[in-house]
Amino acid sequence: MKKEELMLCILRVRKHFSQYLYKLQRYCDNLDTEDKASIVIDDRLEDFGKNCIFIWDIFHLNFNDKKLISAITKYVENECVSDSEQYRDFLDSYRKCISIAENYLIELPFETEVKNEVSISDFLKNISVKVVDNTSQSLYDKVFKIIDIAGMVNPKGVLIFANLKSYFEKEELVEIYKYAVYNEVNVLTLEHGECEQPLSYEHIIYMDNDFEEYEW
């Protein structure tokens, strides 16, 4: 597959397709404790669940999914820690807040203790960081938004869509693909049906009833 293409996997049998999606969802959510899945990233086997974002139903895109928010807070933490001056400012500000709280806690008729250090990701969780979900935003625009998020929080991971082609016209799909390729986001879209002529940026893998794979 060329670097400027994204993967499209077509499964012919609906029953297999549903089972495949169900299994992928469990892998992404790390629910299959007995059957772990891996993905190859930079020639290394990496945990599938930690490196894949699976969009099962784009009509109900949840930008504040626990996994996404956790990835966003981790990204912000890494960025802040890598900037020594900003990180020092963060720690100093937190300690000032602790000092103010302790001025009141010390007056209580019993002993108390506080956490003197806190990670940035924990701090962001405490202030309830969320992605603003514009309900008036079109489904088309929301797909671009999730591509932005996926590319930011895990640029080497994979963003997986199910039935993406069912929701958009060919011209819209090509624009989505182009945006993902331009932003170097690895995208896999899973579809059900017969083989078809690839659109621009598509690299099609066709899977038959016996789960044999054929490239278009």
Q: What residue ranges belong to the model's regions?
A:
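Conserved P-loop NTPase "ATPase switch" module shared by AAA+ and STAND
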Residues: 151-169
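Glycine-rich P-loop/Walker A and Walker A-like loops and their local beta1-loop-alpha1 context
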Residues: 1-81, 85, 170
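GG-anchored amphipathic helix commonly corresponding to the ABC/SMC/Rad50 NBD signature/C-loop
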Residues: 139-155
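Short acidic, S/G/P-rich loop/turn micro-motifs used as interaction or catalytic elements
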Residues: 15, 131-137, 163-169, 196
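Conserved P-loop NTPase mechanochemical-coupling segment
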Residues: 96-138
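Structural motif
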Residues: 10-15, 19, 161-166, 191-193
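Alpha-helical oligomerization segments
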Residues: 170-216
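Flexible, charged surface loops at secondary-structure boundaries
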Residues: 1-4, 150-156, 181-182
